[in-house]
Amino acid sequence: MAAELTSTKLNAENHLLLDQPLLRLPHELARRNLKSFQRIVEREKEYVLPALKEAAKASMSGNQTPEQTLATLDVMISRMQGLKRKMENLQQEEKKIHHQSRKRIQHLNQLYQIPSLTDVKYDQWSRVRLDRLVIDHMLRSGYSESAQRLARAKNIEELVDLNVFVQCQRIAESLRNGETKDALQWCNENKAALKKSQYNLEFELRLQQYIEMIRTRDRAKFVDAMVHARRYLAPYDETQSAEIRRAAGLLAFPPNTRAEPYKSMYASERWVYLSELFIRTHHELLSLPSRPLMHIALSAGLSALKTPACHSAYTSSSSNSHSTATSVCPICSTELNELARNLPYANHTKSSVENDPVVLPNGRVYGLHRLLDMSKKLSSLEAGKVRDPTTGEIFNESELKKVYIM
């Protein structure tokens, strides 16, 4: 009885391992919002305070007319009004992030109010999490509109990262269409964070701009390309010197060249590479998992259920026409069998075995009474014969050997 209670007791901490990104992303967005606030205030302070001092000195010394002083003050007032508008927008964004965080904390806190896995509240909570995982997978796969509709229908818009993934997919799509403007604007907004990134997204984007200039084979564009390289590629000389030398070599090779690496640099597949690189960089900066959460959850669940029998040489009972048994193993199902093929096996420290096991000549083990009862129900089977429920093979009862478990 105690063992049964232990097995059904809900461990909230283990469940929350999968849901860390649920709180990590709002925290990261709040941090970036604060950084933007500090940066805007610092920039305006560096302009307004010196300008105010200069205007005061000029007014007191008589070097400026009252009209000039008023014009200077009008400029400063205009900038401060602009600062106020920006700060109000950032404040609204902060309120939205805090509201989202509060909803997510409330959702996760519900787990601590559920004592058992058999509680109906746990089933309801799990359904909400499943909806979140499905929406996350849809957003990462580019089905943004469908994901938004599902989130609205389930009333869980605060629990999923719709805006973040929609923006990510929009920029990734623009790169696949051969445009770098949106991606470079995103890099400019996240310049400080990109310095710590393991990826060189901005360099690759600037390199692609250079390649497109060279592709035209126009002499005027060649000059523009060299100016572009000195301005945007040269600063990366210490870390990307090999790539910069290859870029210089493009001047001597036309777009239809077969010589590597120039052929690959001209290839249209580079746009796909840039799109994927942007997604990896975007997820790294926002502390998002590189894989969909559904894949992670499925991998853990499939591995926990997988046994060597699931991928044995014999076909599973769910797909075997000779089988007299119906498999309830999810791994043996046609939908999940291939997905689980490369996952590790479950670590079973205890086994549940029939109390009268026998082994058939083909090496498969069954309970004797269950095997005999099943064989008697088959009218086509001769007396003294037994049939393997999984493979359909027929053997003599005398060929059965008792199994002893030490």
UniProtKB/Swiss-Prot annotation:
Keyword terms of this UniProt record: Cytoplasm, Metal-binding, Nucleus, Zinc, Zinc-finger
Gene Ontology MF: a single term: ubiquitin protein ligase activity
Chief subcellular location: cytoplasm
PROSITE patterns: CTLH, LISH, ZF_RING_GID
Bridged cysteine pairs (disulfide): none
Zn finger limits (RING-Gid-type): 329-391
Domain CTLH: 164-221
Coiled coil: none
Limits of the LisH domain: 126-158
Record bears the keyword Nucleus: yes
UniProt-annotated location(s): Cytoplasm; Nucleus
Recorded GO CC terms: cytoplasm; GID complex; nucleus
InterPro entries for the chain: CRA_dom (IPR013144), CTLH/CRA (IPR024964), CTLH_C (IPR006595), Fyv10_fam (IPR045098), LisH (IPR006594), ZF_RING_GID (IPR044063)
BP GO terms, sorted: negative regulation of gluconeogenesis; proteasome-mediated ubiquitin-dependent protein catabolic process
Family that this chain belongs to: Belongs to the FYV10 family.
Biological role: Involved in the proteasome-dependent degradation of fructose-1,6-bisphosphatase.
PANTHER family (UniProt xref): E3 UBIQUITIN-PROTEIN TRANSFERASE MAEA (PTHR12170:SF2), MACROPHAGE ERYTHROBLAST ATTACHER-RELATED (PTHR12170)
Protein name according to UniProt: Protein fyv10
Organism of this sequence: Emericella nidulans (strain FGSC A4 / ATCC 38163 / CBS 112.46 / NRRL 194 / M139)
Lineage: Eukaryota, Fungi, Dikarya, Ascomycota, Pezizomycotina
